[in-house]
């Protein structure tokens, strides 16, 4: 029986990403490998309380940026992490579930809400 858990990372009600992790495949050791690939790994562990939270937040930041900059849905973002398709993201495994992490949904519709914008004379 697999040990798949779903996580939703919300960005201030403006954007969100849903990620499934199969903890039998994406072990704590592998999460540490991802976290340690990037500088400030200890800072992230201390700030977010666990390697899982640190990696989820880092992944959310990275994936949401990809979605916004290229106007992609979840499928498009997953394709950007696919090393076999000529893409891939440095320091990250594929996000199709093959290595224990799967992006299942992404919503960036609230990022550039006109209600959050102001105009000032220059």
Curated annotation (Swiss-Prot):
Highest rank taxon of the organism: Bacteria
A Pfam family matched in the record: DUF2528
InterPro entries on file: DUF2528 (IPR024252)
Its job: The ea10 gene protein is believed to be involved in the production of the Tro phenotype. This phenotype is expressed when phages that possess a mutant cro gene and a thermolabile cI repressor gene are unable to propagate at restrictive temperatures. This inability is correlated with the shutoff of host macromolecular synthesis.
UniProt name for this protein: Lambda prophage-derived protein ea10
Organism encoding this protein: Escherichia coli O6:H1 (strain CFT073 / ATCC 700928 / UPEC)
Name of the coding gene: ea10
């Amino acid at each position: 029986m697999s040990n798949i858990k779903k996580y939703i990372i919300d960005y201030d009600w403006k954007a969100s990403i849903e990620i499934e992790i199969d903890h039998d495949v994406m072990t704590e050791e592998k999460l540490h490998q991802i976290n340690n690939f990037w500088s400030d790994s200890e800072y992230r562990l201390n700030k977010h309380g666990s390697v899982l939270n640190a990696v989820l937040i880092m992944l959310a930041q990275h994936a949401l940026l990809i979605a916004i900059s290229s106007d992609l849905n979840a499928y498009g973002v997953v394709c950007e992490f696919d090393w076999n398709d000529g893409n891939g993201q440095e320091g990250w495994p594929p996000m199709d579930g093959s290595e224990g992490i799967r992006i299942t949904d992404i919503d960036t519709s609230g990022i550039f809400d006109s209600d959050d914008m102001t105009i000032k004379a220059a």
